[in-house]
């Protein structure tokens, strides 16, 4: 019956006044059935994977990240909006996968979590496909070309890059920009030089920065979450330095000025987190011995919060560590990020028990997608490997050069340079961008050497933007778009290198 209906639509489109709607009927036919076109010129390739199925494989690879997006957004919305400080403390102090499952089953249960997550994610997904599809159809009808299957991937990638609180009209505007400006104006699917989903996110990021950063990472109503956090902080007597908040790892990193040095963080870690043998302990002990001349009875590594703040913010000449008093909160916050304590532990970062954009939180989910894409031959493992290597080496070099140049184990170097290199791979959208964005075959190089250069360049730029540029808390988006721009040039030189080798 469906085939008969489609055939009737084809007959209708043969009439002159309905010919302009041929791309729509062709899209319906191609979506439901195998294309029946026979190539008229070589290469003649017989393969079971056409463009439609190629796109569907990418969508399947996105299933783990999509599920985590629904799950995380639902769970976090329930916990953060509960107004219950006990529940919040339990959630933030989850230390392993077993304790996470125990918390879910005992405190909240699965169905409410999924329902809350679906209420957040499904509207954004629907807007992405409806608005993006409408733009595709309009251009196909006007230009008289076929509707490509690229929207299948773009339509799901785009909402996964957004914060859950994004207004619906902004989400619609972003996907429209991504489809129209970064794809259709370049000629449509296969002709774009920039990733459409990432272009749409970049448009929103620069046009509406207040809605793409800050307290936008939990629930669907920022006002409700803000009131709940204030209620919990008030009832427990928490202050800014240790209160509940929506701060992400990268926001904490970005808000830490270069004047916060490594020894400031180490002093806080040794006292408040009871971490023995911090790297700059010799410098801290040297300063503290001078400090005790005027403050007898104080014991290093056993200071109260008030004593610690006084010592860390006192002038160096008096035996203190010279931190500005207004920056103590920043130093305290980044200590958790550098040492992987509490909600910023390596386990939470890997499994995805953190806040952030919908699809970027779980490195594990992204790895599952990466394995699927590599096994099916859809994505380039070279680009992924080069991206990861570039990011890791750049993060390590920042730490190594700081220690080498500054000396004293980098005691007076900016603390932000000392996040362990491996942890950089778990932060923000790096894993998601590495697997699903950087490997876009249209906007990335095609030569093997080009893929290595391209991936390494993006990884390098990601960490440089994170650690050097104070304006942007995340470098993945800008690094990939910059890599997209240079991809044709990289391919050009890769081809020249290949030809010279063959001569």
Curated annotation (Swiss-Prot):
It is a multi-pass membrane protein. It is found in: Cell inner membrane. Its EC number is 7.2.1.1. One of its GO terms (molecular function) is oxidoreductase activity, acting on NAD(P)H, quinone or similar compound as acceptor. InterPro entries: NqrB, NqrB/RnfD. GO terms for biological process: respiratory electron transport chain; sodium ion transport; transmembrane transport. Its cofactor is FMN. The modification FMN phosphoryl threonine is found at residue 248. Belongs to the NqrB/RnfD family. This is Na(+)-translocating NADH-quinone reductase subunit B. It comes from Chlamydia pneumoniae.
């Amino acid at each position: 019956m469906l085939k008969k209906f489609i055939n009737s639509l084809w007959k209708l489109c043969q009439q002159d006044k309905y010919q302009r709607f041929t791309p729509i009927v062709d899209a319906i036919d191609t979506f439901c059935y195998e294309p029946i076109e026979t190539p008229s010129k070589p290469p003649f390739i017989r393969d079971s994977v056409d463009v439609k199925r190629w796109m569907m494989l990418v969508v399947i690879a996105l299933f783990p990240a999509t599920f985590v997006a629904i799950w995380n957004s639902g769970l976090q919305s329930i916990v953060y909006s509960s107004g219950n400080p006990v529940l919040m403390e339990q959630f933030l102090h989850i230390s392993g996968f077993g304790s996470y499952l125990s918390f879910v089953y005992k405190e909240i249960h699965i169905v409410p979590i999924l329902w809350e997550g679906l209420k957040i994610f499904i509207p954004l997904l629907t807007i992405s496909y409806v608005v993006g599809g409408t733009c595709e159809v309009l251009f196909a009808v006007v230009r008289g070309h076929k509707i490509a299957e690229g929207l299948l991937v773009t339509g799901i990638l785009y909402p996964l890059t957004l914060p859950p609180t994004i207004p619906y009209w902004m989400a619609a505007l972003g996907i429209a920009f991504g489809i129209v400006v970064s794809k259709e104006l370049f000629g449509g699917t296969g002709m774009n030089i920039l990733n459409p989903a990432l272009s749409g996110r970049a448009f929103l990021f620069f046009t509406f920065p207040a809605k793409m950063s800050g307290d936008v990472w939990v629930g669907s109503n920022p006002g409700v979450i803000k009131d709940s956090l204030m209620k919990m902080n008030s009832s427990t007597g928490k202050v800014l330095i240790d209160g509940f908040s929506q701060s992400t790892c990268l926001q904490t990193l970005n808000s830490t000025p270069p004047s916060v040095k490594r020894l400031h963080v180490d002093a806080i870690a040794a006292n408040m987190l009871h971490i023995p043998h911090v790297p700059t302990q010799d410098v801290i002990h040297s300063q503290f011995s001078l400090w005790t001349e005027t403050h007898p009875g104080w014991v290093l590594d056993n200071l109260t919060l008030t004593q610690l703040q006084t010592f860390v913010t006192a002038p160096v000449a008096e035996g203190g560590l010279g931190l500005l008093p207004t920056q103590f909160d920043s130093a305290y916050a980044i200590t958790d990020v550098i040492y992987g304590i509490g909600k910023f532990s390596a386990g939470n970062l890997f499994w995805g028990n953190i806040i952030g954009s919908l699809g970027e939180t779980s490195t594990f989910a992204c790895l599952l997608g990466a394995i699927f894409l590599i096994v099916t031959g859809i994505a380039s493992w070279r680009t992924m490997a080069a991206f990861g290597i570039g990011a890791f080496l750049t993060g390590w070099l920042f730490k190594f050069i700081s220690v080498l140049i500054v000396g004293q184990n980098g005691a007076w170097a900016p603390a932000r340079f000392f996040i362990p290199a491996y942890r950089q791979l778990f932060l923000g959208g790096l894993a998601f961008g590495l697997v699903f964005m950087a490997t876009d075959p249209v906007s990335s190089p095609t030569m093997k050497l080009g893929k290595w250069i391209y991936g390494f360049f993006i990884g390098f730029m990601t960490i440089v933007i994170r650690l050097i540029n104070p304006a942007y808390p995340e470098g993945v988006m800008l690094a990939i778009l910059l890599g997209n721009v240079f991809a044709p040039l990289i391919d050009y030189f890769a081809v020249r290198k290949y030809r010279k080798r063959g001569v």
